[in-house]
């Protein structure tokens, strides 16, 4: 494996000063460095990857056993080996119902039965006088459905959906303010029904509903496997939707965690969403690596993060309804691949997954693109753009949006030379030393890599494809890094310390044994309460 990494580093050193734009001297460059599945088009030609680099990268697939591990995942083997679990979120979108075995048992009858229960429940809510749905969850129980509900707003024909995640009381207070407690459904999304943020918010919502004339027993639902705890909370079993331990939180929007989405867009549109994910599953399993979108997206990511040393990756959807996608992918990628230990217990020998961030275009252009274009750090960018929007009467808006997206990817690659900057300053009337000074501020180094995902329109099927694409990208990158992408031990220590700090913050215990900084901060908080 290391010999491939060494060859990749040597290759990167050879091409680091090469102009990406010069690669387009080959008239076939754009077509050769693009791929497509269905209507989803991936262009990675604006990177400094050439045939030699791509072939070296593909060597990582063989060396890591990616194909075999992909088969293991889809066949229900426990590839989440630190927890001894299968990884089968793909089964949630297996609408054809073909057998998927875990420990010799076909899980699909249970998956399809739960899906049908969801359909009946969701349609019942849609047919009732419920006007608002409040989903209470955090992490994967919030980011996925919140992102998908926003993304598919043109397809909403059900109750309004709201999402509460933060334990900060301001979040639930602001959300519940103005809602009719008698016409609100509250969904509590917590697999264990013990997540402290979620349960704190759930108890507050229950008290609010009771105080304002609602009936929590009839107006609460739970997405959980803890039947005893949901019953103790007062939620009838017919209003509880469980899922198995082989569905990780950040991969769970396809099942019961997606109930709020199903209520918003309806069961038929939700099925289309599932079919989009299933279509990407089939593409990922069947397509040759050179035409395989998840594999190519992963290899480009590895080139930039692990070979070129780029520490972050910007996700830039030129689609306002995908404004929450960067946050969703931040959890999906950073919680999955932000690891420093390989599966066998050895240290990861290359950089792990990058920092993932971003914002919707064109908003980001007026916020952080300055750094992307002229900063000292190279930030690989991933653009997403639809050929058309959902508002035909606003087509001129969408055309301007698309023009901005394509212009940004071109500008990142092309840059602006000092000669061009000087010419502009001459036209502006500058001369002498001031001309030179002003020109330098207008130079763009260029050679900043980007990829673009393009699609006809953001509909449920396409959203399903896009989410599954990124899920499988995470899998491939994790396999190449030799890590388990499906645990998240890094979130545990802070939660444990928060539990021990709670009585100290409450003023019920001394700060003995705490470091000076923590003790000082607790003291400040206690002293400054009203």
From Swiss-Prot:
Annotated GO biological process: gluconeogenesis; glucose 6-phosphate metabolic process; glycolytic process
Reactions it catalyzes: alpha-D-glucose 6-phosphate = beta-D-fructose 6-phosphate
Gene Ontology cellular component list: cytosol
Localization: Cytoplasm
EC number: 5.3.1.9
Pfam families to which the protein is assigned, alphabetical: PGI
Active site annotation, chain numbering: 335, 366, 495
PROSITE patterns: P_GLUCOSE_ISOMERASE_1 (PS00765), P_GLUCOSE_ISOMERASE_2 (PS00174), P_GLUCOSE_ISOMERASE_3 (PS51463)
Function: Catalyzes the reversible isomerization of glucose-6-phosphate to fructose-6-phosphate.
Protein name in the entry: Glucose-6-phosphate isomerase
């Amino acid at each position: 494996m290391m010999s491939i990494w060494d060859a990749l580093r040597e290759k990167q050193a050879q091409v680091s000063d090469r102009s990406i734009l010069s690669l387009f001297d080959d008239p076939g460059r754009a077509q050769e460095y693009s791929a497509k599945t269905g209507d989803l088009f991936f262009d990675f030609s604006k990177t400094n990857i050439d045939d030699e680099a791509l072939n070296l990268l593909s060597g990582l697939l063989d060396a890591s056993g990616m194909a075999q591990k992909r088969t293991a995942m889809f066949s229900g083997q426990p590839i989440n080996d630190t927890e001894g679990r299968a990884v089968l979120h793909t089964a949630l979108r297996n609408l054809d119902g073909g057998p998927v075995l875990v420990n010799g048992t076909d899980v699909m009858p249970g998956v399809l039965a739960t899906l049908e229960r969801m359909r009946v429940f969701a349609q019942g809510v849609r047919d009732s006088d419920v006007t608002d749905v409040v989903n209470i969850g955090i992490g994967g129980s919030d980011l996925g459905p919140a992102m998908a509900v926003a993304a598919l707003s043109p397809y909403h024909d059900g109750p309004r959906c709201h999402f509460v995640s933060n334990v900060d009381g301001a979040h639930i207070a602001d959300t519940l303010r103005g809602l009719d407690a008698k016409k609100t459904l509250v969904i509590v999304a917590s697999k264990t029904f013990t997540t402290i943020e979620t349960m704190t918010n759930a108890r507050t919502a229950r008290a609010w509903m009771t105080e304002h004339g609602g009936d929590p027993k009839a107006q609460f639902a739970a997405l959980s496997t803890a039947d005893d705890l949901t019953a103790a909370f007062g939620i009838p079993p017919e209003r509880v939707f469980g899922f198995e331990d082989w569905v990780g939180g950040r991969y769970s929007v396809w099942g019961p965690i997606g109930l709020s989405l199903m209520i918003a867009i309806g069961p038929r549109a939700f099925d289309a969403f599932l079919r989009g994910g299933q279509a990407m599953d089939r593409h990922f399993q069947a397509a040759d690596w050179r035409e395989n979108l998840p594999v190519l997206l992963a290899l480009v990511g590895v080139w930039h993060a692990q070979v070129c040393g780029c520490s972050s990756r910007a996700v830039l959807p030129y689609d306002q309804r995908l404004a929450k996608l960067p946050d969703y992918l931040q959890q999906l990628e950073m919680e999955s691949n932000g690891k420093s230990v390989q599966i066998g217990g050895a240290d990861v020998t290359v950089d792990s997954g990058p920092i993932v961030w971003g914002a919707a275009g064109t908003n980001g252009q007026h916020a952080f693109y300055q750094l992307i274009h002229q900063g000292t750090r190279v930030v690989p960018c991933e653009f997403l753009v639809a050929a058309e929007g959902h508002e035909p009467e606003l087509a001129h808006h969408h055309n301007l949006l698309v023009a901005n997206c394509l212009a940004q990817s071109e500008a990142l690659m092309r840059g602006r030379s000092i000669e061009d900057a000087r010419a502009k300053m001459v036209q502006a009337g500058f001369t002498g030393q001031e001309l030179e000074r002003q020109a330098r501020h207008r130079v763009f180094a260029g050679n900043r890599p980007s990829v673009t995902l393009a699609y006809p329109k953001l509909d449920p099927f396409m959203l399903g494809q896009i989410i599954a694409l990124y899920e499988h990208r995470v899998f491939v990158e994790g396999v190449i890094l030799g890590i388990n992408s499906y645990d998240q031990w890094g979130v545990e220590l802070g939660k444990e310390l928060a539990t021990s700090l709670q009585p100290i913050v409450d003023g019920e215990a001394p700060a003995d044994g705490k470091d000076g900084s923590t003790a000082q901060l607790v003291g400040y908080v206690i002293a400054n309460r009203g």
